[in-house]
């Protein structure tokens, strides 16, 4: 039997029905962690998608998305895809106006969705983006310009559109095929102009299916995403994989500055107590450095015991899929040191950690 080649839309429809009332999105709002169900996530994505259609977005047209990680980032991307559009996720780390300008122009984006924090970057270049018809702002602001509209207005437009055109909207999103483009992911452009990588719906869903064979989690498990959502790694190993398991994802609360957001990471870890996290090598090295600094502060004996325990665990686990084997004799030591050393390390990550998934670049075995 040949499996159906799923689109992201197929994927979302399947799992939001299967896990309808389970929590999918977690976000801290005014100091309180809020929960959004699979059903509510789909409903908001439908409204945003229908609102974009009402605004004028046509199938295959591009929408740039520039925002910190948050629930509205995810539902905005899903809304773009439901409307038949192509998301162009932009990194908030892009500070040079020319970097943003190139990507928006090169992708031929017709709309830009942006957070209040990033809005000034778009306003500074919008005069040079003649193809952009509207800027959609994710946060309430006091000074909307003529070409700007609130996401709440898009959602309201979507609600009205669906009252009269629900069947047409369904026909639209059901017409999307696995080989239709879902995303244009730009390279960093450090040595030349950035390259726009065209990714199809099936690129994503196939990767999720492959990733699910490696990342094993349970329904209801929680992942804290500390990586930028514009990165493909965060898409695949992050919210689409967790969606397939009936798990939920939490995003780090947005600070007033990038540094403030970074400081929110350890707070979020303690509050969310995630079972899974994603990391790139540079971030993993920072976590390890922080752990080993704490170990060294406890004295030479503890430091040497930690080093012995770590080396023993590395030799036993190897690449994990081939753990044990002729190193199986190390297993009792692995269990012993897990109780007296590594349990404390896990407690620092909330106490429920199952997987710390590395990717995005070459990851050392250590």
Which functions belong to the PLM regions below?
Residues 67-70, 91-93, 227-232, 360-362:
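Conserved AMP-binding
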């Amino acid at each position: 039997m040949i499996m159906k080649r799923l689109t992201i839309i197929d994927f979302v429809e399947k799992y939001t029905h299967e896990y309808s009332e389970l929590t999918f999105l977690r976000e801290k709002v005014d100091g309180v962690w809020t929960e959004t169900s699979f059903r509510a996530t789909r409903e908001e994505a439908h409204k945003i998608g229908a609102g974009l259609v009402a605004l004028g977005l046509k199938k295959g047209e591009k929408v740039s998305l520039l925002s910190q990680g948050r629930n509205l980032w995810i539902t905005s991307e899903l809304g773009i895809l439901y409307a038949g559009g192509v998301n162009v996720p932009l990194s908030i780390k892009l500070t040079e106006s020319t970097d943003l300008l190139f990507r928006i122009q090169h992708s031929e984006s017709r709309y830009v969705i942006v957070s209040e924090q990033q809005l000034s970057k778009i306003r500074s270049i919008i005069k040079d983006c003649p193809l952009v018809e509207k800027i959609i702002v994710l946060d309430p602001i006091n000074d909307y310009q003529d070409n700007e509209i609130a996401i709440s207005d898009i959602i309201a437009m979507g609600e009205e559109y669906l009252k009269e055109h629900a069947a047409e909207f369904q026909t639209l999103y059901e017409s999307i095929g696995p080989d239709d483009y879902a995303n244009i992911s730009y390279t960093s452009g450090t040595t030349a102009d950035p390259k726009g990588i065209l990714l199809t719906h099936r690129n994503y869903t196939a990767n999720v299916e492959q990733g699910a064979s490696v990342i094993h989690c349970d329904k209801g498990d929680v992942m804290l995403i500390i990586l930028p959502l514009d990165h493909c790694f965060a898409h695949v190993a992050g919210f689409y994989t967790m969606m397939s398991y009936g798990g939920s994802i939490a995003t780090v609360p947005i600070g007033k500055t990038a540094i403030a957001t970074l400081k929110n990471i350890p707070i979020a870890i303690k509050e969310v107590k995630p079972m899974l996290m994603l990391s790139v090598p540079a971030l993993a090295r920072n976590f390890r450095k922080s752990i080993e600094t704490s170990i060294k502060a406890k004295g030479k004996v503890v430091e040497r015991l930690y080093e012995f325990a770590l080396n023993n665990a590395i030799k036993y686990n190897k690449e994990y899929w081939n753990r044990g084997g002729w190193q199986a004799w190390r297993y009792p030591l692995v269990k012993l040191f897990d109780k007296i050393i590594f349990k404390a390390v896990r407690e620092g990550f909330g106490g429920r950690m199952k997987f710390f998934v590395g990717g995005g670049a070459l990851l050392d075995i250590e």
